[in-house]
């Protein structure tokens, strides 16, 4: 077996990782282990991941991590809070939402073009998701931006309140 990495020409950051297994018996063993092939050598349902694979919390985390790495994105928190995973199958989107709910993450699903998009809009929920999938550095960067935004908003609210109070006092005195 060997691992190969291919970089996309259009996106410098984007890499695909491939595991090349040359031994056919080992390929069958791997396919059976991940439940894509039954013990009777029948193909499984490609629309979802077999429930036996995602029974444990560690497996749920790995499943969500893999889905996010393959088909996910998160917007710059300075612009807004939005995390999404775009998949082709409605059943897989429902499964992703279900696995997120095991970690008390309330995701939504919307259809966009040919994709089912599982998304989170709330900042705290995005932080929880990043923690679940083990993206701790991204979580810290996200939180730092969130904290700065909250402080700015708080200061702006206080300034607006003080300005309104001063305006009321001036208007009352006049």
Q: PLM features: what roles do these ranges have?
A:
Residues 1-2, 6-146:
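DNA-contacting interfaces and partner/effector-binding or oligomerization modules
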Residues 132-174:
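Extended mid-to-C-terminal alpha-helical interaction segments
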């Amino acid at each position: 077996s060997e691992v190969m990495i291919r970089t996309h020409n259009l996106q410098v950051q984007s890499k695909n990782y491939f595991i090349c297994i040359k031994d056919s018996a080992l390929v069958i063993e791997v396919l059976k282990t991940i439940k894509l092939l039954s013990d009777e050598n029948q193909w499984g349902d490609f629309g979802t991941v077999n429930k036996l694979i995602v029974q444990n919390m560690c497996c749920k985390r790995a499943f969500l991590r893999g889905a996010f790495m393959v088909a996910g994105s998160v917007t710059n928190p300075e612009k807004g809070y939005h995390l999404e995973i775009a998949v082709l199958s409605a059943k897989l989107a429902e499964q992703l939402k279900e696995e997120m709910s095991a970690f008390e993450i309330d995701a939504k699903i919307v259809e966009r073009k040919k994709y089912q998009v599982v998304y989170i809009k709330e900042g705290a929920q995005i932080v929880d998701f990043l923690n679940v999938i083990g993206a701790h550095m991204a979580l810290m960067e996200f939180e730092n931006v969130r904290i700065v935004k909250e402080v700015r908003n708080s200061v702006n609210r206080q300034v607006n309140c003080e300005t309104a109070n001063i305006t009321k006092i001036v208007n009352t005195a006049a």
